[in-house]
Design a protein with these regions (language model features):
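Surface-exposed loop/turn segments flanking beta-strands in extracellular/periplasmic regions
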Residues: 1-7, 54-64, 117-126, 182-197
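Gram-negative outer-membrane beta-barrel transporters
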Residues: 2-112
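Asparagine-centered polar/low-complexity signal
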Residues: 9-10, 146, 168-171
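Residues that define the transmembrane beta-barrel architecture of outer-membrane proteins
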Residues: 13-17, 76-82, 141-145, 158, ...
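Outer-membrane beta-barrel proteins
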Residues: 24-29, 84, 88-94, 149-155, ...
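Intrinsically disordered, low-complexity acidic Ser/Thr-rich regulatory segments
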Residues: 62-76, 129-138, 197-208
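C-terminal beta-barrel architecture of Gram-negative outer-membrane proteins
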Residues: 75-154, 178-179
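C-terminal beta-signal and adjacent terminal beta-strands/loops
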Residues: 102-120, 151-211
Length: 211
């Protein structure tokens, strides 16, 4: 579309199922271990329809176009997760918590507009180009380590707790938090014709080490 446009979608259906398990293990009088894991499948079950309007005058640019979303995964939702947490409760209100959290099998948020026939089929001049428009990118696995030191003070029936936390202990600055496909398309001139390619995926990075 050569103009700024808005989109309305209908008939979006997803299928979600999975399982999770947790365990709290007391290792010693002052130590315990928390474990958790989950596995699931979250995907689009049907192909929705999309109507695209020109922003300036509400002209319909594409009406009830099928968006080929079937079998795309729901974006930015980890389908595999794991967690382990150690807790130490020392004397006089001192304590330490250490946590490790992992998320895997994550995908970027797919674009409805990019998968319509007008975009993916008409502007893709080869099967390889069509694959560029419709392939859903998988995000890398994410691992974060957190540590917390705390001290509790007791006043009769009340308690005051002071905490010092370090998040993303490894200071991984390249860890991706989420991402989404751009609905926009690049037009590239080659010789006497044009080819079309999707714009790069937009990413949101996780915070570096924070206190």
């Amino acid at each position: 579309y050569a103009t700024y446009s808005d989109m309305a979608a209908a008939g979006i259906g997803t299928l979600r199922y999975g399982a999770e398990a947790t365990a709290l293990i007391r290792l010693a009088y002052r130590w315990n271990l928390t474990l958790a894991a989950s596995a699931g499948r979250y995907r689009y079950a049907v192909n929705p329809v999309v109507t695209v309007y020109a922003d300036a005058n509400n002209e319909v640019l594409d009406r009830n176009a099928t968006s080929y979303m079937g079998d795309c995964s729901v974006g930015n939702t980890p389908q595999l997760t794991g967690f382990a947490g150690f807790n130490y409760y020392g004397p006089k209100g001192w304590g330490v918590q250490a946590e490790a959290a992992w998320a895997g099998n994550r995908f970027v948020e797919p674009s409805l507009v990019r998968r319509t026939s007008r975009i993916a089929r008409q502007q893709a001049e080869s099967p390889e180009a069509f694959e560029l428009f419709t392939r859903q990118e998988r995000l890398g696995d994410a691992l974060t380590l957190n540590v917390t030191l705390f001290k509790s003070f007791y006043f009769n029936a009340s308690r005051l707790t002071l905490m010092l936390s370090v998040r993303n202990l490894l200071n991984d600055k390249d860890q991706l938090f989420s991402g989404y496909e751009s609905p926009r398309v690049r037009r590239i001139r080659t010789a006497d014709t044009y080819v079309y390619r999707p714009l790069d995926t937009r990413y949101l990075y996780a915070y570096p080490r924070t206190f």
